[in-house]
């Protein structure tokens, strides 16, 4: 083996070791992101919803700032109910769905926890698509506005 090949192999191994320390991303967030794009027909990037208002993104508290933020609170509550009543792990639950001309739809074969989580995501994605987006509510100071 050539010395250059050994260096490349070593670099790959070191980078893989570093990546093993990174926490895995919840699988469901990928599906939910795709579902949002289906519902809004690609009009707004999913990243715009990651740090919006008091509830869109990680965590949530206080009173939602507008209709879109209420969609996120409803979604958070839906996941919370799935965790409590069905013992689901919504962020890790993988389900089957399709993107139709009228928006996202859960596969009819899904039941139990998968169906509940899929329904939560469809409801939220449709809600996002129907709610106005206010740029002033993106990346707000949650300590001040979300009491």
Swiss-Prot record:
E.C. numbers: 3.1.1.4
SS bonds (residue pairs): 38-99, 54-146, 56-72, 71-127, 78-120, 88-113, 106-118
Gene Ontology molecular function: calcium ion binding; calcium-dependent phospholipase A2 activity; phospholipid binding; toxin activity
EC class: hydrolase
Location in the cell: Secreted
InterPro entries assigned: PLipase_A2, PLipase_A2_Asp_AS, PLipase_A2_dom, PLipase_A2_dom_sf, PLipase_A2_His_AS
Keyword Disulfide bond in annotation: yes
GO cellular component: extracellular region
Catalytic activity of the protein: a 1,2-diacyl-sn-glycero-3-phosphocholine + H2O = a 1-acyl-sn-glycero-3-phosphocholine + a fatty acid + H(+)
Cofactor comment: Binds 1 Ca(2+) ion.
PANTHER family: PHOSPHOLIPASE A2, PHOSPHOLIPASE A2 FAMILY MEMBER
Biological role: Snake venom phospholipase A2 (PLA2) that inhibits collagen-induced platelet aggregation. PLA2 catalyzes the calcium-dependent hydrolysis of the 2-acyl groups in 3-sn-phosphoglycerides.
Protein name listed in UniProt: Acidic phospholipase A2 S3-24
Native source organism of the sequence: Austrelaps superbus
